[in-house]
Every structure is written in C-alpha cells, then in structure tokens.
C-alpha cells in the first residue's frame, strides 16, 4: 500500500512539532524547578543570616555574663587628669586610675562610678542617683478630667488658671507688667468639693508633666528618708519641666510644729523643713509649679502658708444652688432621664457637695434599674436624695459621737 508524498511530509511535520512541544514542556519544567530552588535558596540564606544574628546576640550576652561585676564608688576628689580619690561601696577610700574610656570632665565630686574588681580603676561613670519612689509619682498618662467636667467652681477655676497655667504658657506677661508670678496654690475645703478634680484638670489642660504626691507618702520611718524623698521629687520636677507638683492631703506632712515631740513627730518636722526649703528654692519664674490640697487648713503650720510659698490660697466651698444645678447637669449628661426638673432637685440637695451629688445620680440610676426601667424619673432622684442624706447624717452622727467620747 502506498501513501501520497504529502502524507509522509505531514507525519514528519507532526513528529517534529511533538518533539518541539516536549522540549518546550521539559524546558518549562526545568525553569520552574530552578525558580523553586532559587526561592528555597533565598529562604535558606535569610534563615542563615537570622541564625547568625541570633548567634551574635547570644555570644554578646554570654560575654556579658562572663564579665565579673563592678564595684560601685563615689568620687571624693579628682587629683589630676588620670587619677581620682574614690570612696568604694565596701568602705575604704582609694586613689585610683581613670580608664581611657572615661572623660576626665565627668569625674567630679559626688559622681557615681564603677570600679574594676582587680585594679579598682574607674571604668564607667553612672548617671545621678534617682529615687524610684519619686520616679513612680510621675503620671505617664494625663487624667481624663477637663475644666468643663467641673461644675460650680468657675471663680476657683479662673484663680487656679491664673496661678498655674498662665505663668507656664505666657511668662512674658508677668515680665511686661513687672510682677513675679505666684509660686504655688493651696486648695482647701470640705471633702468631696472637687480639690483633686481641679488638679487633674490642670494636668490635662497643660502640656506640663504632672507629679502627684500624697502627703503621707513623704512621712518615712528612718531619719532623713522623708527629706531625701522630697529633694528627689523636686529634682525630678526640674528635670521634667515644665512640671506641676500636686501634693494631696498636705496636712499629713505640714501640720503645726509643737514642743512635745516623739521620734516620729521629729521626722515629720524634718520632712516639713525640707519641703519648706525646696519651695523657697526653685525659681518663681521657672517651669515648676506646686498645687496642694487639704481639708484641714486649721492644723497647717503657719510657715507653709506665708506668701512666697503658697501665694494664693483658694477655698473650695460647698456649691450654692446654681453650682449644684451645674453639677447635676454634668452628671446627668449621659443619663437617660425623663421629665426631671433638675432645678427642683438642686434646691432639695442643700448643703451637698459634688461627691454627694454624684452619689445621688448613681443611686437614682440604681433605683431605676431595680424597678426594671431604662430611664430615671424625679421619684428616683428624690429617693436617692433621702438615701444619700441619711448616710451623710449617720456619718456625721458617728463623728459627733466619737468627738464626745474622745474629746
């Protein structure tokens, strides 16, 4: 059987096409394998680099662990460019050499240094010592209280802004007028009137650092410890300036000095004297301001009340009717109230302070929840007033009873 010539040619052409297709497919497969290998190689290279980095870090950590500890010392005097007299932490004084890595200008009396165990040479200069308790008093996050969240204290807010905010933000105004800006402000008044709230609002409204101290934290057991903490607090404030120091319950450390003293009373008086010295010491036009709060101004030492220490003494009294109404509006702003005449409630809340009004609003909400409602009515507020007033009267009766018993 014979085939046409063109048939043979077609077969040969198809065979060549098939062969060419197989070659292309094989090449494509090879290229794909090469690409996968290249990607795998890159991954291995990256892992290798990462392992080398980790290995270097571990080696450095191991070297640190192998280095013997250094001895702490305090510089007493620098003899020349390469020698100094140092008091070691173990007790004796040494004349030691300075390492080439230490700048001679950093070796000053009182500087903390590290000494080599073998040669006692100065190998490092440490930063100034700081009391961790003073560092912990700085607020990293600003409080969330604004002046608009405080009701019934418009005059007091104006006064504290003039004393604290204005000298920090516009000190040139005082220079133009030719007066010295106030150094500090003392807030006094019954508990719950908003003294601490004012300090929080100042911290929020200014860009200054804020150091909060409770007076009892400055009272320590051992001699000189409280005074050292006071020094460290003011040193921290200067380093963080502009800064505001807020001393809450200052009567714990600044009560009147008497002649009959126990050991604890003497230490409190030493702390007070250090506080007085620090308040006199910092620059009045500097960026450090002090705010203090107390509900017992009658027991404060006269020395701390004189002008130059607390230049402005602001009374935070119980609010009047308009002030109570303003406070009720602030606390009920996010409450679901229905047909409530806040003016009437404010009239009924006579002699109440801000903390009492907040308690009334909370109790009114609790009465509504107890009855299964999602809104608060006038009845809830009236019942809350009776409940909070009853608690307050019982508390005052208890205090009067204790006063009668113990004088």
UniProtKB/Swiss-Prot annotation:
Pfam families (alphabetical): AAA, AAA_lid_3, Prot_ATP_ID_OB_C
Subcellular location: Cytoplasm
Keyword terms, alphabetized: ATP-binding, Chaperone, Coiled coil, Cytoplasm, Nucleotide-binding, Proteasome
Recorded superkingdom: Archaea
Biological process per Gene Ontology, one example term: proteasomal protein catabolic process
CDD domains in the cross-refs: RecA-like_PAN_like
Gene3D superfamilies listed in its UniProt record: 1.10.8.60, Nucleic acid-binding proteins (2.40.50.140), P-loop containing nucleotide triphosphate hydrolases (3.40.50.300)
Gene Ontology CC: cytoplasm; proteasome-activating nucleotidase complex
Transmembrane segments: none
Residue positions binding ATP: 192-197, 331
A molecular-function term among this protein's GO annotations: ATP hydrolysis activity
InterPro entries, alphabetized: 26S_Proteasome_ATPase, AAA+_ATPase, AAA_lid_3, ATPase_AAA_core, ATPase_AAA_CS, NA-bd_OB-fold, Nucleotidase_PAN, P-loop_NTPase
Chief place of localization: cytoplasm
Spans annotated as Docks into pockets in the proteasome alpha-ring to cause gate opening: 405-407
Function, in words: ATPase which is responsible for recognizing, binding, unfolding and translocation of substrate proteins into the archaeal 20S proteasome core particle. Is essential for opening the gate of the 20S proteasome via an interaction with its C-terminus, thereby allowing substrate entry and access to the site of proteolysis. Thus, the C-termini of the proteasomal ATPase function like a 'key in a lock' to induce gate opening and therefore regulate proteolysis.
Family: Belongs to the AAA ATPase family.
Subunit structure: Homohexamer. The hexameric complex has a two-ring architecture resembling a top hat that caps the 20S proteasome core at one or both ends. Upon ATP-binding, the C-terminus of PAN interacts with the alpha-rings of the proteasome core by binding to the intersubunit pockets.
Comment block on domains: Consists of three main regions, an N-terminal coiled-coil domain that may assist in substrate recognition, an interdomain involved in PAN hexamerization, and a C-terminal ATPase domain of the AAA type.
Protein name per UniProt: Proteasome-activating nucleotidase
